[in-house]
Amino acid sequence: MSLRNQLLGAFAYVLLLIIVALEVPLALNLARRIDAEVKNEAASQAFIVAANASGQMGNLAELRKLARSSGRTLGARVIVVGPPPNGRLLADSTVAAPPNTPYASRPEIARALQGFRVQGERHSDTLGQDLLYTAVPVTNNGKVVGVARVTQSLSAVHSRIRRGVLALV
């Protein structure tokens, strides 16, 4: 093998190492950014549902229509829960739970009923998949009158991250 071929091989190897060394941190950063973007988008969606539900908490027909239309638009499950202390289900974009099911004991609902935004990931044994949930308080004149929760599958989030990382490669 000639010296020229050895130098070209060494140059190609060093170039490959440089590309990999730059690509890995970039891919990790991109994955974190996409994850943060998806979570911020979910929070925005939950706040929009809460704002729309604010003046409708006494009108169950309108709340149910809001939950169904929001669920279709967002491709997520949307629920609206009534005021503390009971925190009963008022509207659901699916028919997963009957109306008046108590939700106040669920950690994310209990925290949102205290006025906090709650977001996290958990596994649903019922659905057999991992979920991203976002629960926000529904307020009216500064008082918490309920909770809006948006729940979406994490498989869609993970596939979006995967597509973004693969686009780099």
Give the label of every model feature segment:
Residues L63-A135:
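Extracytoplasmic ligand-binding sensor domains of the Cache superfamily
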